[in-house]
Amino acid sequence: MLAYLDNSATTRCSERAKDLMVQILMQDFGNPSSLHGMGVTAEEYIKEAKSNIAKTLKAEEKEILFTSGGTESNNMALIGTALANRRAGNHIITTEIEHASIAAPLEFLKEQGFRITKLSVDKNGHISLEELRDAVGEDTILVSIMMVNNEIGAVEPVAEAAKIIKEKNPNTIFHVDAIQAYGTVSYTHLTL
């Protein structure tokens, strides 16, 4: 028997979700930007999904943006933030154990002249908050730490990290990749 150990990243679709997706793909497939009936129906599905996600995160619907997935979201967040804040500094902090969707755009930014600091982790995969405190400086524009590691499941102390970052440099933007945490770890964007 095959043991599937990547359930947090890719989970089998529930029957209920599958049935709804088949209905949408076969019957309610209108362009949600169109004004005709099928488009309006498709838009309603999107609004309902946005509302449900916002409720789980205690966020406002306008704060929820849909992309094709985590990689696109992380690329937009990291590259966009770094390039938009380049005049404020060129230092970015991350960890040694980030997902490729974080590591790859940071490698690109390094090639563009940004200085990247990678925090080490202990034997359990946790960062040192003291090392983070020492790393944040006046030129630090961005810190990116995943909330739950996709390979070993380590839960990082992101709420504590947020406090340290804001204490050391209130202008530093804190990016948290919470893809693995959604639905399993209790958090909201307000707790960061």
Predicted regions and their residues:
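Alpha-helical structural signal in soluble globular domains
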Residues: L20, I24, Y45, N52, ...
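Short acidic capping loops at alpha-helix termini that bridge into adjacent secondary structure
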Residues: E60-I64, A88-N90, E138-D139, N171
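Conserved PLP-anchoring active-site segment centered on the Schiff-base-forming lysine
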Residues: T81-A103, R115, S120
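Active-site phosphate-binding strand-loop segment of PLP-dependent enzymes
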Residues: T117, V121-A181
